[in-house]
Regions:
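Mature-region segments of soluble proteins
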Residues: 37-38, 50-59, 66, 73-183
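N-terminal secretory signal peptides and thylakoid transit peptides that target proteins
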Residues: 1-14
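C-terminal segment of N-terminal export signals and the immediately downstream linker at the start
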Residues: 1, 17-55
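Compositionally biased, low-complexity repeat tracts
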Residues: 7, 26, 34, 168-171
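A generic secondary-structure signal for well-formed alpha-helical elements
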Residues: 14-22, 26, 64, 132, ...
Length: 183
């Protein structure tokens, strides 16, 4: 199994707290969310939160020879999940965690995370990655953001078909197919 495939499944697992239990599969739901994005504007994240989520998502999966998180509309994907699937309590905790990320950035010399140097951004995200077990605040928000970024990235059509080259090979059951035994 390739590294990106492993990360895809891990991302789906990390995003499960936001996904309703009646969904057929996490992958199918992610693909459906991407289909629904269309021209839907951000509804939960304000402009500052959009910029923060976009910056962090791109740090998690940057643009290289393959598309980055923003190229496959991961920030919009996250906003749609927050808007339509997260409970009011989950949404409030996530948004409070985003505020906490900016508060922690102030301790590193900038009033907002997006204004930190690249090295300081990585330093803060590394610290938050170690604090993901927190039940609230920046650690929780970063853990959810990381999971949703990976989930949104690997369930996008561009990544699934063009990067991972996933092809569905099940064409359904075909009964009464002529059979000639090999001699």
């Amino acid at each position: 199994m390739r590294r990106r495939e492993v990360v895809r499944f891990l991302g789906a697992a990390l995003a499960l707290p936001f996904i309703p239990s009646g969904a057929q599969t996490a992958i199918q739901l992610g693909e459906e969310i991407h289909r629904r994005l269309g021209d839907v504007p951000f509804r939960t994240l304000d402009p500052a939160q959009q910029k923060l989520v976009t910056t962090i998502a791109e740090l998690i999966i940057p643009e290289t020879d393959t598309p980055g998180a923003t190229s496959v509309r991961v920030p919009e994907f996250i906003d749609l999940i927050l808007t339509e699937w997260a409970s009011a309590e989950e949404r409030a905790a996530f948004l409070a965690g985003l505020t906490d990320i900016d508060t922690r950035a102030a301790a590193l010399g900038s009033p907002r995370f997006v204004d930190l140097s690249a090295a300081k951004k990585i330093e803060l995200l590394t610290a938050l990655d170690g604090a993901r077990a927190d039940k609230a605040g920046a650690g929780l928000a970063f853990g959810r953001l990381k999971g949703l970024t990976i989930y949104g990235y690997f369930t996008s059509k561009l990544v699934d078909q063009d990067i991972l080259k996933t092809q569905m090979f099940f064409n359904g059951y075909q009964g009464n197919v002529p059979f000639t035994p090999a001699v």
